[in-house]
């Protein structure tokens, strides 16, 4: 059982080069990024060290749209309670950007609140195979959403950290939620590669750059999301990994 728990946590981390956080870190940290867009960071412990996972939520006239979920089900209620306390609105939509627990782990909880839950068909097939809770609604790789007056776009750039991850683009704010395909600026390596497609990863990042050339903020999936060198640093890490692999062969 312990081996399974540790393996699941490694999957969720998506990287081994994360920096540790002190014990004073809150269960859920919320920071305003733009007018109605907030970054939330949650923490989990692996081998006695605390790590961070980042995602966002959008406050609309209709309610709150949550991208991904807090990392650990014990944080779900506190998170949604805090949203209601801050904004006086309920969560009406949840979108999982890939199948790992720090992204799709809240699908069942958000559904229980009456929120509509979404994932790509690819993510849904992985969740079904793993016998995990699935989204109510699925879509092909790319989809545009409009909630009230707010619009955002889900885009599949190709394989990288996993086969199924997508990014989310908020055009009004020029914010890209990169998730785990984008490594933070201080990541030391590509991390967990058990489900990765390293040879496809560079092209997938280039696809993101081509699709969204005017990014003002990029939110990496883990660690320091405020470091805006994340996209280039991801490309550098991929190149370093490939060079090491080539040298060892």
Curated annotation (Swiss-Prot):
Q: Which segments does the entry list as coiled coil?
A: none
User: Subcellular location, in the record's words?
Assistant: Periplasm
Q: Which domain of life is it from?
A: Bacteria
Q: Name one GO molecular function term.
A: beta-lactamase activity
Q: Which UniProt keywords apply?
A: Antibiotic resistance, Hydrolase, Metal-binding, Periplasm, Signal, Zinc
Q: What is its EC number?
A: 3.5.2.6
Q: How is the cofactor bound?
A: Binds 2 Zn(2+) ions per subunit.
UniProt signal peptide: 1-22
Cofactor(s), by name = Zn(2+)
- Which InterPro entries does the entry link to? Beta-lactamase_class-B_CS, Metallo-B-lactamas, NDM-1-like, RibonucZ/Hydroxyglut_hydro
Q: Which GO terms describe its biological process?
A: antibiotic catabolic process; response to antibiotic
Binding residues annotated for Zn(2+) 2, in chain numbering? 102, 180, 222
List of residues binding Zn(2+) 1: 98, 100, 161
Identify the Pfam families for this entry: Lactamase_B
Chain positions recorded as substrate binding sites: 183
**Reaction(s) catalysed (UniProt annotation):** a beta-lactam + H2O = a substituted beta-amino acid
A GO cellular component term found in this entry reads:
periplasmic space
Please give the function described in this protein's UniProt entry. Confers resistance to the different beta-lactams antibiotics (penicillin, cephalosporin and carbapenem) via the hydrolysis of the beta-lactam ring.
**Quaternary assembly:** Monomer.
Q: Which family does it belong to?
A: Belongs to the metallo-beta-lactamase superfamily. Class-B beta-lactamase family.
Give the protein's recorded name. Metallo-beta-lactamase type 2
Its gene name is: blaB4
């Amino acid at each position: 059982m312990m081996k399974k728990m540790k393996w699941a946590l490694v999957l969720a981390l998506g990287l081994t080069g994360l920096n540790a956080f002190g014990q004073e870190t809150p269960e859920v940290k919320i920071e305003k990024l733009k007018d109605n867009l907030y970054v939330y960071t949650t923490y989990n412990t692996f081998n006695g060290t605390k790590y961070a996972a980042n995602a966002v939520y959008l406050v609309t006239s209709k309610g709150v749209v949550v991208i991904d979920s807090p990392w650990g089900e014990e944080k779900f209620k506190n998170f949604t309670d805090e949203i209601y306390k801050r904004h006086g609105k309920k969560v009406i939509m949840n979108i999982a950007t890939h199948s790992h627990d720090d992204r799709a782990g809240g699908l069942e909880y958000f559904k229980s609140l009456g929120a509509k839950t979404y994932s790509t068909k690819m993510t849904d097939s992985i969740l079904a195979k793993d016998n995990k809770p699935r989204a109510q609604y699925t879509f092909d790789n790319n989809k545009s959403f409009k909630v009230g007056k707010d619009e955002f776009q889900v885009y599949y750039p190709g394989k990288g950290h996993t086969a199924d991850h997508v990014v989310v683009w908020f055009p009004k704010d020029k914010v890209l939620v990169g998730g785990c395909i984008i490594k933070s600026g201080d990541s030391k390596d590509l991390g967990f590669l058990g489900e990765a497609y390293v040879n496809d990863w560079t092209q997938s990042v280039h696809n993101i750059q081509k699709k969204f050339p005017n990014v003002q903020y990029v939110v990496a999936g883990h660690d320091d999301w405020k470091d805006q060198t994340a996209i280039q640093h991801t490309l550098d890490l991929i190149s370093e990994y490939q060079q090491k692999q080539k040298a060892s062969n």
